[in-house]
Amino acid sequence: MNPGFDLSRRNPQEDFELIQRIGSGTYGDVYKARNVNTGELAAIKVIKLEPGEDFAVVQQEIIMMKDCKHPNIVAYFGSYLRRDKLWICMEFCGGGSLQDIYHVTGPLSELQIAYVSRETLQGLYYLHSKGKMHRDIKGANILLTDNGHVKLADFGVSAQITATIAKRKSFIGTPYWMAPEVAAVERKGGYNQLCDLWAVGITAIELAELQPPMFDLHPMRALFLMTKSNFQPPKLKDKMKWSNSFHHFVKMALTKNPKKRPTAEKLLQHPFVTQHLTRSLAIELLDKVNNPDHSTYHDFDDDDPEPLVAVPHRIHSTSRNVREEKTRSEITFGQVKFDPPLRKETEPHHELPDSDGFLDSSEEIYYTARSNLDLQLEYGQGHQGGYFLGANKSLLKSVEEELHQRGHVAHLEDDEGDDDESKHSTLKAKIPPPLPPKPKSIFIPQEMHSTEDENQGTIKRCPMSGSPAKPSQVPPRPPPPRLPPHKPVALGNGMSSFQLNGERDGSLCQQQNEHRGTNLSRKEKKDVPKPISNGLPPTPKVHMGACFSKVFNGCPLKIHCASSWINPDTRDQYLIFGAEEGIYTLNLNELHETSMEQLFPRRCTWLYVMNNCLLSISGKASQLYSHNLPGLFDYARQMQKLPVAIPAHKLPDRILPRKFSVSAKIPETKWCQKCCVVRNPYTGHKYLCGALQTSIVLLEWVEPMQKFMLIKHIDFPIPCPLRMFEMLVVPEQEYPLVCVGVSRGRDFNQVVRFETVNPNSTSSWFTESDTPQTNVTHVTQLERDTILVCLDCCIKIVNLQGRLKSSRKLSSELTFDFQIESIVCLQDSVLAFWKHGMQGRSFRSNEVTQEISDSTRIFRLLGSDRVVVLESRPTDNPTANSNLYILAGHENSY
C-alpha cells in the first residue's frame, strides 16, 4: 500500500486475497489473507460500519501508527474504507491469541507466563517511550506467531477504531483489566501509561487462572468495587502453586497507587522476567495447542462423582413402527382445541439473530424490544461520544450510559392506566426511596396485558371474537408447533407470524406494525418470510386451534422440567429435558426417528433457555450451571465419536480440553433450591434469582457477554420448606422484589399479602408477617400491576397490594373443582392441570372452555416456556415409563 495514503478508498481485494476466516469478534471478522503482489500473509479485520459513523478522527492516528515498528508489536500495514466496511490490515500471527491458546491448553506454566510477560513489557516500554498507551492489554490482545514471537495487537489505530465501535457492542467486557484510577478517573483526575502495567498484572493472573479477577461479577459491580477506597488489589489464588517471585511480580504490577506503580522499564528488571527465558517456551505452548494431551488438563469435578447407574446416551421411543392402542386421554387430545399460550409482560425476550446479525421473520415472534434506532432517538444520541476517559465522565458513568444505550436501563413507561390503589401501595410504602428518574419513552397503552405461569409462559388478554383488538407493546407468543405426521415437512411458504387466528389477529398485526414503524419497511419487502424453525410449520390462517400431540412413547427418564430451543444455524427446534439422569434433548424435526440424546450427564432439577445459553440447577450439590447450547450439542457429537469401550456417562464433563468445556458452574450458587427469571418491563433488564440454603443470589443478563452475572448476594433465612419463589417487578425500583411466601391479607380488601425480600435495600431487609402462609401453588406477574395467585382450587387475580382486580373484561376469581397442581395461561383462559387431567376456564366468564379427564393416567406439566410439554403415566403403575406430549397444531389444519 502506498505509504502516503492514510485511509485508502480502493478495493482491498485488488491488493489482498482472502484465504479463510480465522476469527470472529464482537465488532467484526478476522481473515487470513495473502498480499497478491508480495505473497506475504496478513491478518485483515473487516468491520461493518453503521450509518452515520465517521472515522475521520482516526486518520491522524493511522499516520502516527506507521512509525510504530517493534518486534513485540503487530505490524500495521494499512486500512481501507470500502462501501460500509472498514478493512484493517495487519501482520499475520499464526499462533493465535493467548486467550485462544489457554482455552485449549489450560493454565500456562509459570515460565511461560514469565516469558509472555517479559515480551509484553518490552512492547509496552517501546510504546510508552513513543508517548503512546495501549489501553487494552489482556490475553485476547497478545498474539503468538508460528515461531513463538509475542506480539501486542489492538492498540493505536485498532484501539481508536475499537473505541468507537465498542461503544455499541464490546465495551462492557473491558473493566476487568482496568486499573482503579481508570475506573475513578473523575475523582482521581485522569490516568497515564501506568494503567497498562496494571493490566499486565491482571493478564498474568488470567494466564494462570484462565480468567481475570472478579470475572464472575457483573461489570458494573466490578467497577463499583474498584472505585471503593477499601479496594484491595487482587492476588493469585493458589499461594503454594506459584513461586514467591511470581507472587511479588503480580503484587508490584498491581500496586493500587499509580504514583508508586513501577514503569515498564522498572518491571523489566524484576527477577521474574530477568531469569533465563527463551522462545522455546512459546514453541512448547504452541505444540501443546496442536497436540493437546488430555491427561494434562483434567479439571475433575470433585463434588459430582460419576453417575452410579449407567444411563443410555441415546433413548429411542418405543413402538415407533407398531400401531398401538391409544389411551382414552390420547383420543380426547386429538379432539379438544386450545389457543396458544401467550407471552407475559415480565417474560424475558428470546431473540434469534440470523447469520447476518439481523432478525428474519422470526423477529415478529420473538423480538419485542425497540430497535437500536429507537433508543438512539429516545436518548438524543448516536454511537458517538467519548470513549477514552480523560473526558468529563467517570468510567462508571460511561458504562452506565452504555447500558442505557443498549436497553439494559431504558424506556420507563407512563403509568396512566394504573388503578388508584397502586398509587397508595402498601407494598411500595416499605420500599426504599426510588432511584433517580430515568428518561421516559413514548407511552404505549398497557391495559391489554396479562399473563401466565412459573415457567415463563404468558398471557396477553385478547378481546373475544368480534371485538376490535387493541394495540399492545408485547407481541403474541409464538404459535404452538405443528408436527409432521410421518416425516419432516420442508417449510417454504410460511404465513405471517402474527396471523394467529384469522382476521382478529390480522388487525393485531397491522397495529403492531404501526407501533414498530422502523421494522415495517423491512417486513413489506419480505413477500415470502423464512420459516420460524424446522419442526414448526406455519400457523394456519383459520382458527383451527391446537391440541396435545404425542412426541415420545415409553420414556424411562425421571423428568423434572422441560424447555425448548431453536438452533440458529439449522433452525431445528429441540425440546430440552432436565432429569435425574441428566439433560436430554429431542429434535422435533426428526420425529420420524424419535430418539433422545444426552447433552449433560449430571442430575438436573430446573432449566431455562436464554438465547443460546442454557441455565440449569445440576449436580449432586445442586449448583447453578451455565451451558453454551451450540457448544453442548457439538460436545454431544464428540462424545458419540468416542470408542464404545468408553461410556460417555462415565466421563467427567470437563475431561476434554477447556476449548470443549461448554458447561460452567456459576460461582457461589451451591445448594440452590429454586430459581426464577424475570424481565423488568420498565427498564428491559433481565434477572435470574436463586434461593440457596441461607441466602439469595441475584444475577443480571449482560447482553454483550451473553451470560448472567452476579450483582447481589443477600443473606436471608430461607423458609423451609420453600413453597414459593418468584420475582415481582415494582415501579421505580431497579431490582425486582423476591416473593418467598404468600399470607392472608390484613388490610382492607386485601385478600393476600406477599412476603418479599427487597434487593434494592442497603441492608438484608424483608417483610415480616405474623399470619400463617397460605397454601399457594403458583404466583406469576401477568402485567405491571396484575398478579395471578393460585390457591388450592382457586385462582385469584390481584394487584401488587394483594387486592382483587376488578374489570368488565376479567374475572377476579376463577374456581375449579380439583386441587390445582400447575397452570398455563392461554389467550382467553387459564388451563389448570391436576392429577388426572386438565381444565380450562375463561378469564371473562369463569366458564369451562376445555376439559380432559382420564382416571387411568397421571398427568404432570413439565414446562410451558415457548412449548407446553406434558407427561403422562399409568395410574396403576406410576413408576412405569412415561409418554410425552406437546401442545401443537395438526398437519391437516391447513
Swiss-Prot record:
Stretch list, region Disordered: 410-536
Record-listed Phosphoserine modification sites: 329, 398
N-acetylmethionine modifications at: 1
Active site positions, chain numbering: 136
Domain Protein kinase: start-end pairs: 16-273
Gene Ontology terms for molecular function: ATP binding; MAP kinase kinase kinase kinase activity; protein kinase activity; protein serine kinase activity; protein serine/threonine kinase activity
One BP term from GO: protein phosphorylation
Amino acid composition bias (Pro residues), ranges on this chain: 473-487
Enzyme Commission no: 2.7.11.1
Catalytic function, reaction form: L-seryl-[protein] + ATP = O-phospho-L-seryl-[protein] + ADP + H(+); L-threonyl-[protein] + ATP = O-phospho-L-threonyl-[protein] + ADP + H(+)
Classification via Pfam families: CNH, Pkinase
Presence of keyword Transferase: yes
Record key words, sorted: Acetylation, ATP-binding, Kinase, Nucleotide-binding, Phosphoprotein, Serine/threonine-protein kinase, Transferase
Residue numbers binding ATP: 22-30, 45, 48
Compositional bias of kind Basic and acidic residues: 513-529
Segments forming domain CNH: 556-867
Function: Serine/threonine kinase that plays a role in the response to environmental stress. Appears to act upstream of the JUN N-terminal pathway. Activator of the Hippo signaling pathway which plays a pivotal role in organ size control and tumor suppression by restricting proliferation and promoting apoptosis. MAP4Ks act in parallel to and are partially redundant with STK3/MST2 and STK4/MST2 in the phosphorylation and activation of LATS1/2, and establish MAP4Ks as components of the expanded Hippo pathway.
Subunit structure: Interacts with SH3GL2. Interaction appears to regulate MAP4K3-mediated JNK activation.
Assigned protein family: Belongs to the protein kinase superfamily. STE Ser/Thr protein kinase family. STE20 subfamily.
Protein name listed in UniProt: Mitogen-activated protein kinase kinase kinase kinase 3
Gene: MAP4K3
